[in-house]
Amino acid sequence: MLKATIEADIFRETIDAVSALVNECRLHVDEKGIRTITVDTSNVAMVSLELSASAFLTFAAEPCEIGLDIEKIRSMMSMIGKTDIVSLELDESGKKLKISFGGYEYSITLLDTKTIRKDPNAPNLNLPATFEVPGVMFNDAIKASSMVSDKISLAVSAETCVFTMNADGDSDRIKRELTGDDVHYLTCADARSLFSLDYLKDMGKSIGRAEKVQIRLGTDHPVQFSFVYAGGKGSVGYLLAPRIEAD
């Protein structure tokens, strides 16, 4: 059972964060809120999201799993006004989700959770560099880098504690360094890995809305991004595997 209302902006941020990587997901619902964890079809990236019941205007739920077709929900997002209140209600059969806003009422057929991939286990990674940067600065650097290349290196120097983003194309190059007040280190250590900009561009749309994004980085290891939204009542985590450089 699920019956809830939520502000349009929070609903939109929730859908955008998940749809950055996947078209469908298994949503876990209970009295504490909602959560999901899933990987993309190429097994290159993972997204996890939690949204507390307190982030909703009203929230009543019993433990259940919902199979969401994210693309269906995204298709209606342009119809939702910024000041709309979105109502969510699971029907008695558990096979349809009613989404209402601004005079519209959609009834969406849910996916059979048996057809959705099982939740992945979050890997326990040794990533020595942990730091925070403004979400908008990171996203701006990703957008700029994508104009010259399809890959980007993320690196930290233990000696200088400078975070460097470097994109090399066939003939052009973009480099962005964050130092001083723009980067806050929890642990400063040498780290460098190469990543696909296609994935980072998709993640960046949500990361760019966050005041701060925490980055955990190693050498030739996946990178982890985490940030909060909905006034700290929601959290998002991304994990992206590195691109292996040819010798």
UniProtKB/Swiss-Prot annotation:
GO molecular function ontology, one term from the record: DNA binding
CDD domains linked to this entry: PCNA
Pfam families: PCNA_C, PCNA_N
One example of a Gene Ontology biological process annotation: regulation of DNA replication
Record bears the keyword ATP-binding: no
Keywords: DNA replication, DNA-binding
Family according to the record: Belongs to the PCNA family.
Subunit structure, as described in the record: Homotrimer. The subunits circularize to form a toroid; DNA passes through its center. Replication factor C (RFC) is required to load the toroid on the DNA.
Purpose: Sliding clamp subunit that acts as a moving platform for DNA processing. Responsible for tethering the catalytic subunit of DNA polymerase and other proteins to DNA during high-speed replication.
Protein name: DNA polymerase sliding clamp
Source organism per UniProt: Methanocorpusculum labreanum (strain ATCC 43576 / DSM 4855 / Z)
